Amino acid sequence: IFFWLTFLYFFLRYMIVDKYMPINADGQKTEDGEKKGGLGPLFTIFYFVLIIMSQLFINMKLTQTICGDDVQTSTAMSATIIPNVLILGVVYIMLVLVPGWKAPFSNTFGYFAANLGGIRDVLNTLTNTNFEEKGEGNITLKQNQINIFKSIYKNPSQLINNITPENFHKFLQTMQNIKYFKPSNEHTDKNIKKLYSLVVIKDLVSQFFWYMLAGYLVITTTFDSLINMKCQSSEQRLKELAAKSEVN
């Protein structure tokens, strides 16, 4: 259940919220980004509520099995909420405050997913390849700049791994200022939006793996806690047990 809820959360976040550029190349807020931006926190709150409620339901059933049909509500609640707050909650906060934590998964699994989506081709489509020629529409640069740009064009993986949703606008401005990207037009702007959406995929895949690790730790911690708990029988349950013992 945790896997599918987490997968659905990130899929919907991408499709409805995160794939839209919040700021365009000119530094102006985009219409789509402005409309969808406020939905992100709502998705996150709804996700955490669903995760805790689903785990609580399962854990209450587990206590019922362990304690002979006597549900341990308070024990199940503490064993569910505390690990989620201390583990999954802390991971969420750290990924927001320290985005660099996402790099190990973003630069591996995230890069693989973005590469399947064609991020290298999109980046190369944006690249100005006419550095050495002179004439209308072409760029003349120093030889060392040309060599650097050619190297990046042949193997853009390092450049791709340095792009994040947080620094995308700054990256875009830098590429345009040094003339690495082609001048802005309708076709270029469309590819920039596509590049951003693929960078977001790379980032979300990284977050997904972090959540899965945290979720695994939460579930194992909760399970161990419930397996070793002391059952607290209700007054009604004690009366039933006493009646059975008298009959015997």
Located regions from the model:
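Membrane-proximal N-terminal segments immediately preceding the first transmembrane helix
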Residues: 9-24, 180-196
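N-terminal first transmembrane alpha-helix
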Residues: 1-112, 201-212, 223-240
